[in-house]
């Protein structure tokens, strides 16, 4: 079932968001592991972020997805993927979706200080000034605790 979750999150032309959400919930209620990974340590959440699907991201978070899970190959978290300028092929022009996803991940506890295998945090990749500001605010709050 992990691949089924990923398949729903990787649709190039996803169905309406509510339909995608219902499909994910059905799989999760049937026992799919929300944090299952493929051979590269990539979760359904990583895929949902890459394919710029806020509805899928929100649903997976609601069902306990680990927002700080790192990929085995690159060490990237879902937040790393969210702030990069390019998503998956076919997701061009979805900047607003990327911003919404960053907000969802941060609200769920994504740590903007986590470095990938290249030693870079999400803030090292972000180009959008609003995203940069959100990451900086979260980093300051984390350090203040």
Which sequence ranges carry the predicted segments?
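N-terminal segments that cap or nucleate solenoid repeat domains
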Residues: 1-40
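Ankyrin repeat A-helix N-terminal signature
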Residues: 7-19, 47-53, 81-98, 125-129
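Glycine-rich, flexible loop segments associated with nucleotide phosphate handling
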Residues: 17-26, 77-78, 93-107
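Ankyrin repeat domain, specifically the short helix-to-loop turn at the C-terminus of the second helix
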Residues: 25-33, 58-66, 103-111, 137-142
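Ankyrin repeat boundary signal
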Residues: 34-37, 67-71, 112-115
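Start-of-repeat signature of ankyrin repeats
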Residues: 41, 74-75, 119
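Alpha-helical adaptor scaffolds
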Residues: 49-76
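Leucine-rich solenoid repeat scaffolds
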Residues: 106-107, 111-143
């Amino acid at each position: 079932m992990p691949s089924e979750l990923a398949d729903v999150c990787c649709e190039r032309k996803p169905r309406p968001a509510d339909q995608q959400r219902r499909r994910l919930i059905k799989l999760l209620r049937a026992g799919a592991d929300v944090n299952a990974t493929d051979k590269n340590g990539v979760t359904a959440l990583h895929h949902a972020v890459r394919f710029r699907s806020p509805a899928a991201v929100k649903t997976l978070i609601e069902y306990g997805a680990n927002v700080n899970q790192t990929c085995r190959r690159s060490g990237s978290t879902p937040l790393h993927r969210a702030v990069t300028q390019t998503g998956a092929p076919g997701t061009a022009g979805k900047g607003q979706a990327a911003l919404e996803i960053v907000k969802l991940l941060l609200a769920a506890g994504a740590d903007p200080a986590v470095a990938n295998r290249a030693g870079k945090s999400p803030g090292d990749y972000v180009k959008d000034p609003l995203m940069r500001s959100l990451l900086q605010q979260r980093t300051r709050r984390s350090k203040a605790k």
